Amino acid sequence: MAKKQTKITKEETLETILFNCRNSLRGRAAMTDKRDLLLTLVFLKFIGERFKQQKDKIRHEIVEVQGIHDEAFVEMQLSRPNQYMQDGVFFLTDETFWDKLILTAPTGMAIAFDTAIKTLDDNEPKLKNALPQQIFTKTALEPGVLKSVVDEINKIDPKKFTDHDLIGRVYEYFLQAFSINADKEEGEFYTPHSIVELIASLIEPFDGTVYDPCCGSGGMFVQATKFIEAHGGNTKAVNVYGQESEPATYRLAKMNLAIRGISYHLGDKAVSTFSDDQHKDLKFDYIMANPPFNLKKYAEYGEFETDPRWKGYGVPPASNANYAWILHILNKLDVNHGIAGFLLANGALDDSDTLEIRKQLIENDKIEAIIVLPRNMFYSTDISVTLWILNNNKKGGPWHGRQLRNRTGETLFIDLRTWNSNIYEKKYVRLTETEISRVCQIYFNWQTENFAEYAEPELYYAAHCDEIQQKGYSLVPSRYIEFIDRDTEIDYKSALTEMSHQFDELKKRWDANEAELVNAFKILGYGKE
């Protein structure tokens, strides 16, 4: 009797599923349309999962906790939208619920999903203009192709993939993948995870308001929320405000935040922060940002020359927005205790065109720390960039459980350019958790310890304002951090003697090998007698 064979099913990884989704659409639509379609499906899948989880939670509360077993009463409570909305969960009908949508026949799937998007856009204020309208009919995928993609997305089961942040892994996979394959401008919306984590860890946005004037897909807000959760804080104590000028990325931000249940205020439309500040009269406790590097053509609005945000500092160059971002961020900070962490190209550290503005920032004591990051951390550029920390309160006092000292007139410089050993995707650099902790340790110790001299060669140095003044108001860390001259450690006489010995040894080996080779040819009859 033949032996019965056991069929072995290979367990699919999350990355395999997500790759299959991308692969199914290869060559079938424009890149941005593929991104929007896939992220919309992920969005519908996960709001459906949160809806089911909330439904189970409500039933458990009524039946198990309150002891009410009247099924009619239970069903009535389950059908009340406010039972879901109070926990940041969207109330879904059969028309918008993933588990119902995926039962649609393949030929009607595109219309069903587009209808679900329009229904959510009409009925959920937070999702107004967040989802791409008619994206499924626009891409015109064959019914079988769309069905295969939907089936792949449906495999992403929270019960199977128990990651702490499964939503984040899925969203970041697509954002990262499309950023890697995009050109520079299309890749601007994605800030590497380890950089965002570093910013959040340094400025500690535990409570109050968090603002990003160029929020991209909302990554800064997501990381801030995760930071709060990791430290046992209350995410509902934080209010998120942002703005984004690119319409497609504006939609991504709304989807990214809504899918996680993060309450947000992103303004009424996608528009430039410079020409139309959507939060004009507000000041914020924390600001996290990754503005487009060296942005040009940002100043084409009527009030540029007289913009009140430049008051006391001078008008920034119209040809490069770096210092316009700095002044905007400073203008939006709470005047008593606001703190900001943001990224700029290294050229902003010593740009001659902005010397007077930089001089005023230093003399007004707004710059707390300058941290140069390693190269190759971004998908869209290989340049090294700088993390700036601005602080409106360097006078000291209690802060998140620590007693800070008075740091008036001081700026901490940190140089991380050599921290480039953690490579992924063959060439990109990512800071490790240990490295992020080390930077925080340097920064926090400097904030709290008595300051006499705070320095470590080739890594950090705390400079007084008068030192910065003496160096022409340059903020380049290498102007302050001590770098050891390795040449002075070399004993040249001994080194030359050793090299001479090595050369003599090589010459002896060469002569011996040559003699053996000549002898071998003689034996073969080719040598001279």
Regions found by a protein language model. Give the residues of each.
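Non-catalytic, mostly N-terminal accessory regions of nucleic-acid modification and defense proteins
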Residues: 1-203, 265, 269-278, 372-375, ...
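Conserved Class I SAM-dependent methyltransferase catalytic core
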Residues: 20, 24, 33-46, 199, ...
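Short, contiguous acidic/charged loop-to-helix segments that flank catalytic cores in large enzymes
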Residues: 28, 298-320, 345-352, 374-380, ...
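Active-site catalytic pocket residues across diverse enzymes, especially alpha/beta-hydrolases
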Residues: 51, 228-232, 333
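Hydrophobic alpha-helical scaffolding
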Residues: 139, 160, 214, 242-246, ...
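Conserved S-adenosyl-L-methionine
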Residues: 185-289, 294-312, 324, 344-347, ...
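Short, surface-exposed amphipathic charged segments that create phosphate/polyanion-binding patches used
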Residues: 285, 383-390, 427-433
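Extended hydrophobic-aromatic, low-complexity segments
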Residues: 296-300, 338-341, 351-355, 370-371, ...
